[in-house]
């Protein structure tokens, strides 16, 4: 229903509308789960396509074939490279210590420019974290890990999280990894620690962490659009045909008193490249090696001619219902839904009858 008084279409809750600090999105809140698993994953946005599927959610179209636009996010395996432990401080959680795995050689990355020379994980990680210890041996690692175990037994540590890095060289995107932190589900610090300890230095694939059919929250930095006027940025009305001094402006920027311009007045400025979270996106399916298995048949998810501005999907991928924020090739993070609806869809892959692989050019 329309409103008589409508100064803007955009929400002031997101003010100030400025550029995000980092292109790697942050996650400040985590769902509480008893299952021991990493609470989320990360990948790179490849593009969109559409599918036909049998609707398995309660409603008028239940059991019928429906059209569904989907986003493909390529998810090369994450590498767990450390543990971060927190103690309870006066103002909240404080970092108590970190344990980083010692350096090792990567089997899945060989530099063509360096005549086949293999890179170590540290060499690539240092492109993102300049403060990594230089002379860090296996003995140092085991000593730090033992100290952390003692702190957990004494009850000093209240939370442990996994430090992970993406591996974009696996999908031939770039060399510099993205580094981030993920919470772990579980009821005690000990079982969370044991889970991360087992995964340290190893790869973690999306199928080990997420389940087909579950609801996810998608966190990303939106497409940047630069400086835009108040009509596009805030959705204000165009002024009348014969209005003076411009049509795409606000009619008044405020009263005489208070003798200043309020921050709530819709003005021109930065639009896009904002940090945003979209809730309750369904994970339709998970594929491996760029292929989706449907009724025993393997289907290449890459459309004819490749995804525009992206190319070929080579690794594991997520198929998420609807659109997600962010530009092509941008890092996208997901976590299990923190505020799921009361009527949740079943946690299983819906029956997919058709996947569009026609050209998107």
Swiss-Prot record:
Gene3D superfamilies: 3.30.1430.10, Ribosomal protein L3, domain 3, Translation factors
GO-annotated biological processes: translation
Region listing for Disordered, in residue ranges: 339-361
Keywords annotated in UniProt: Ribonucleoprotein, Ribosomal protein, RNA-binding, rRNA-binding
Stored PROSITE patterns: RIBOSOMAL_L3 (PS00474)
The keyword Ribonucleoprotein appears for this protein: yes
Entry's Gene Ontology cellular component terms: cytosolic large ribosomal subunit
Listed GO MF terms: rRNA binding; structural constituent of ribosome
Skewed-composition ranges (Polar residues): 350-361
InterPro entries documented for this protein: L3_arc_euk (IPR045077), Ribosomal_L3_dom_3_arc_sf (IPR044892), Ribosomal_uL3 (IPR000597), Ribosomal_uL3_arc (IPR019928), Ribosomal_uL3_CS (IPR019926), Transl_B-barrel_sf (IPR009000)
Ribonucleoprotein listed as a keyword: yes
Any Pfam family matching the protein: Ribosomal_L3
Summary of subunit composition and partner proteins: Part of the 50S ribosomal subunit. Forms a cluster with proteins L14 and L24e.
Function: One of the primary rRNA binding proteins, it binds directly near the 3'-end of the 23S rRNA, where it nucleates assembly of the 50S subunit.
Family, similarity comment: Belongs to the universal ribosomal protein uL3 family.
PANTHER family attached to this UniProt entry: 60S RIBOSOMAL PROTEIN L3-RELATED, LARGE RIBOSOMAL SUBUNIT PROTEIN UL3
Full protein name: Large ribosomal subunit protein uL3
Phylogenetic classification of the source organism: Archaea, Methanobacteriati, Methanobacteriota, Thermococci, Thermococcales
